[in-house]
Every structure is written in structure tokens, then in C-alpha cells.
Amino acid sequence: MIKHILANLGFLLQIAGLLTVLPILVGLYLNETQTLASLFLTCICFLACGFLLNALCERKDLDFKSSCVLILLAFLLMPLIGAIPYFYNDSFNSPNLADRFTNAYFESVSGFTTTGFSFMLNSDALPKSFLIYRSMTELMGGVGIVFLLLAFFHSRKSLNGLGNALGIERIGGNLKGIFFSVFLIYGVYIVVFTIVFYLLGSQDIIKTGSFVIDTITGGYQPSLEPYSSIPMRICIILLMFVGSVNFSLNLRLFTLKLKKALSKEILLYLLVIIFGTVLILFLTRRGALTSLFHVVSMSSSTGYDYIGIPAIDETTKSIFILL
């Protein structure tokens, strides 16, 4: 059983290693030497461990117990390897090695689980390749969980049932194909919205790409100050929405099955957003767009805020908590 678990874990580690190539390319282009060394080491560790596990172990279907072990191992080992750049660069100015390791592992776990907690006082000051890597960990963990969920559904009958829930009519047995299709769709979102933000006036395309990843995964919270125009905030609302809905909506939009895209769950979510927006607008008098922005932010667990939620009244806070 343990070999089957390790083989599946090896596949995830290989994906993480491949995704680390992007920040490496950014670092090479910008000549960020110190950060590059840590990123190269991280990439090699991910790929070496992944290929080793795949070479020594044969991947087979997992039962429920094995899948639980896989999830635990993935969210322990991936952040451990992913903590190398944080530890190497010591972005926290830690007083000793123990604190440096603890801070690095905490930051890495926060990224891979898309929790978004951070000890960094000014993440925008990080080297750009490091900033991209930090955002990519959210993509590894956030999208990687799709594969982990697929591991629960080990029989063909269960896989087809999951396929219907995801909006994939024929899932077959090609789990890797499904996994890459998820990456492809979210990759298109990231590229398109990065270009749109750049055309709308964002000056730094690399930081913009990092911001888009942070928004669609609902993890780290970068500064909203560079994205304060109305068109940009509308784009942020769209990003938060597509990042929070069921994958079936995104898949059907890409396959132009628009009639099937509006499922009962999506319609209910839209009604919650509309009702919440009207309620917040009535209570705060902040404007329709501002109310909509914060309702989508809270209901999608993104957590963006530019009105100062800690200072508003308790009734409005309670509504945001419910959302």
C-alpha cells in the first residue's frame, strides 16, 4: 500500500518541480542571482524526489485510507521542500536557524494550503522571481488538491460520478489528463487577466501576474493600491468569482456549453451575491461596486478589503462572516 501512495506523491512532486521552472526563468531574465540558487535547489529536489518515487513505486488506485495518508504526506512534504527558498534567503531576518526554519516552513505551508497567512511585512519588496515562486506555491497546492480528490475515487464508477460533479462527462481513467486540463484552464485565466491588467495601466507585468495568481487562488493578500481603478476592480471581482466556483462552470465556459454552465448551485451563489450586495449597500452606503467587491471577496474567501472592515459596525461584520 505504501508504494502506491508514494507513487502518487511522486507525481505531485514532479508537477511542483515543473512549475518551479517559471520563477527560475524570471530570475534568469532579471539576473536575481541569490534567489536563483535557492530556486534551482528547490526545483532539483522536487524533480529528484518525484522521479525517484515514481521509479521505485508503481502507481495504482488507492482506497479511502490510502488517500487520506496521501493528502497528509503531500501537505507535509511539498511545503517542506518548498520552504528552501524562504530558508535560504531568510526573508524574515530570523535571529537563529530554528526560527528561520520555523518561519520558512510556516510561510510555505501557508502558500501550499492557500491559507494566505504571512510573517513578511513587505512582500512587494521581494525579488520578482521569489514573488512569482511564492504565488506558484498557491497554484501547486490549490490546483494540486484536485488530483488528491481524484485519488479518493479509485473505481471507474466513482470516477465517472466525480466527472459529472466536475462537469466532465467522460472522465475515463486518465487522471493525469484531467489534472493537466485543470492547470490549462487556470493558466489561461492567469495569462489573460495579467495582460488585461497590464493594458489597464499596471506598470509591472511580473508583479501583476503574481497578483492574479494570489487572487484566483484566494491565498496571499498583496496590496490593492496599484489596482484601484474601476475597470481593474471589476476584473478583480471576476477573478475572485471564477476562482471560487465549481470547476464545472469554468470547463463549460471554455467548451462553450453556456446553457449548462448555469447550474442550480451557480444560480444560488449568484443570488447570494446579489442579496448580499444589496444588503451591504443599504447598510454602508459605500456604492454598488464597492459593496459587490467586498461581498464577492468575503463569499469567495479571498479576503480583500479596501473599506476598513475592522472599523465598520457589528451588523455589517456579521453579514460578512455569514458570507
Q: What kind of feature is each model-predicted range?
A:
Residues M1-L323:
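Membrane-proximal intracellular helices of multi-pass ion channels
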